[in-house]
Design a protein with these regions (language model features):
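Alpha-helical transmembrane bundles and membrane-interface segments of multipass inner-membrane proteins
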Residues: 1-154
Length: 154
């Protein structure tokens, strides 16, 4: 359980710090890091990950709260190291974007998420979005390998 929460806290902290940096450094100045392949561009996103479904900010906020509550409830039961990392990445990513939705304008549960990483032909995203996607990939891999999240002790 400690691994799950350490992973979540680390992702949340990295996401928080990088968003603060993006707000400070990228306001009117997008930066080309690797030509047009990788750019840092500040975007205020009212939708879900990768700017999907804008206009449903409150619904996504409530869903994120449900994910956080469920994760905290089930966390003590997860014994697999791989699943702890996957769920920790998910929790950290969800908390990162939920922090924006709670504390950023236009207001409580409807705040815009700060996105800043841009690749060609792909929506602008952030560290939290990346963590959620990596969590999904790990969970998919663990599921395909039939790795249970909970090892039953007999």
């Amino acid at each position: 359980m400690r691994r799950l929460f350490a992973t979540a806290w680390t992702i949340w902290l990295i996401d928080f710090v990088t968003k603060a940096w993006a707000l400070q450094s990228l306001n009117a100045n997008p930066r080309k890091i690797i030509g047009t392949f990788l750019q840092f561009t500040l975007v205020h996103n009212s939708g879900a990950a990768f700017s999907f479904a804008t206009g449903f900010t409150i619904a996504f906020s409530l869903l994120a709260l449900a994910v956080v509550i469920a994760t905290i409830y089930f966390a003590p039961k997860i014994t697999s190291m791989g699943w702890q990392v996957a769920i920790g990445l998910l929790l950290g990513g969800v908390l990162g974007n939920l922090t924006d939705r709670i504390f950023r304008t236009p207001g409580f549960l409807s705040g815009h998420v700060i996105d800043w990483i841009q690749l060609p032909n792909w929506p602008v995203f952030n560290i939290a979005d990346s963590a959620i996607c990596i969590a999904a990939a790990i969970a998919f891999t663990l599921s395909m390998r039939n790795v249970p999240p909970i090892t039953r002790v007999r």
